[in-house]
Structures are given as structure tokens and as C-alpha cells.
């Protein structure tokens, strides 16, 4: 059995990253795939479920896990801590499950150092205007927060060239097709196919 692949997916807020990942998992039942669920010390928001949206833990628990080097990466954001579980991801990959990690460029850098076999994708909006329109359409943030997100988007986008693949989410269906094509191509690489079809290859290569 071949190991799963870790996919690092980054994008500015509003580019459609979460929607594309969710659509991929819902419409691609052929492969075993999961989304990594981060640990966080922030409080649970209405509608969130522990273990689904995040693994909610205390600051003390987070500190202990950090000291045990249980996180592939971790960061502090607005006074709250977030981390990606190393044991969980390694367990899924060893089972042949592809794991998708929704993370910013800084976290992506940390993970690529520790797991160089990971594949990285960056999702771009077609324009600044469209990105701002999407942020406004969500109806979640004030004008001040949207302005800050637009500033953050420029910083995030400036690192797109550090990624293996780039998808422009102008048309959602087309972007989803591109996303699926990347996963399919990675699954067809020689090392993956060799592990999957090892018995067949041995039979084909056996002397008569």
C-alpha cells in the first residue's frame, strides 16, 4: 500500500480555499481523503463542534503538546494558539489517506521543512476587486476587518511562487477540475503506482 500525500493548501481569505477543499472531498469518493483538524486554545464559537472544526484545548494542554514536539507547526494568532498535530497526520498518511491542510504561507514553510514530500497548492482570486466583493458578500466582517483582510491578502499572495501548484479560482467548477487533476496526477506517479500494483508488476516482469 502506498502512503497518502499531505497537501498544503493556502490562499488569502475569500479566495474559496475551504469551499474547494469541501467540494473535492464531497465529489471525489474514489480516494481516501481527510482534512486536518487543527488544535486551538480559542473558545468555541456558535455552531462549531469539537473535533470537527477544531480540537479545542486549554493553554496548558497546548503548551504540553508543544514541549512534546507534537505539532508540525504552531502559531499565535490574535492571542490564541493554533497547531497541527504531527502524530495524527503521520498516522493518516501511513494508512494511505491523503490529508489536506488549510494553512497560511508561514505555516506552509514550517511544514515543508519537516515533511518535504508534501505537495503545496496556492489558490488565487482573479482580481482584488473580486476578492473584496466575495469578502463583502459573506456578510461576516465589518468594513475595518475587510480592509485588514485585503492588506493581509497582498502579503499572502506575494508568496504564491513558493508553491508547487497554483489555481486561479475565477470559475469555481473549473478551479475544482484543476484541483482534482492535481490529485489525480499525484496518484499516478510512478512510486504510488508501483506500491499499488506491486504484485501485478512482479507477475508482468517474471520470467516465463
Swiss-Prot record:
Matches recorded under PANTHER family: GUANYLATE KINASE, GUANYLATE KINASE-RELATED
CC terms in the record's Gene Ontology section: cytosol
EC number of this enzyme: 2.7.4.8
Family: Belongs to the guanylate kinase family.
Residues involved in ATP binding: 11-18
Function recorded in the entry: Essential for recycling GMP and indirectly, cGMP.
Protein name (Swiss-Prot/TrEMBL): Guanylate kinase
Catalyzed reactions: GMP + ATP = GDP + ADP
Source species, domain of life: Bacteria
NCBIfam families: guanyl_kin
Species name: Photobacterium profundum (strain SS9)
Locations listed in the record: Cytoplasm
HAMAP family: Guanylate_kinase
Positions of the Guanylate kinase-like domain: 4-184
Amino acid at each position: 500500500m502506498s502512503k497518502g500525500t499531505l497537501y498544503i493548501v493556502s490562499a488569502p481569505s475569500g479566495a474559496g480555499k475551504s469551499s474547494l477543499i469541501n467540494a473535492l472531498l464531497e465529489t471525489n469518493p474514489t480516494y481516501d481523503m481527510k482534512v486536518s483538524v487543527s488544535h486551538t486554545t480559542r473558545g468555541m464559537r456558535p455552531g462549531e463542534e469539537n473535533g470537527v472544526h477544531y480540537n479545542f484545548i486549554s493553554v496548558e494542554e497546548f503548551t504540553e503538546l508543544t514541549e512534546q514536539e507534537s505539532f508540525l507547526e504552531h502559531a499565535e494568532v490574535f492571542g490564541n494558539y493554533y497547531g497541527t498535530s504531527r502524530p495524527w497526520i503521520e498516522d493518516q498518511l501511513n494508512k494511505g489517506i491523503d490529508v489536506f491542510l488549510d494553512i497560511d504561507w508561514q505555516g506552509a514553510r514550517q511544514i515543508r521543512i519537516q515533511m518535504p514530500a508534501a505537495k503545496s497548492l496556492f489558490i488565487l482570486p482573479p482580481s482584488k476587486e473580486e476578492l473584496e466583493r466575495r469578502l463583502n458578500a459573506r456578510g461576516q466582517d465589518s468594513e475595518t476587518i475587510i480592509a485588514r483582510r485585503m492588506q493581509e491578502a497582498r502579503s499572502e499572495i506575494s508568496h504564491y511562487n513558493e508553491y508547487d501548484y497554483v489555481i486561479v479560482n475565477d470559475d469555481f467548477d473549473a478551479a475544482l477540475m484543476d484541483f482534482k487533476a492535481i490529485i489525480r496526477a499525484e496518484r499516478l506517479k510512478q512510486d504510488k503506482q508501483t506500491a499499488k500494483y506491486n504484485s501485478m508488476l512482479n507477475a508482468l516482469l517474471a520470467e516465463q
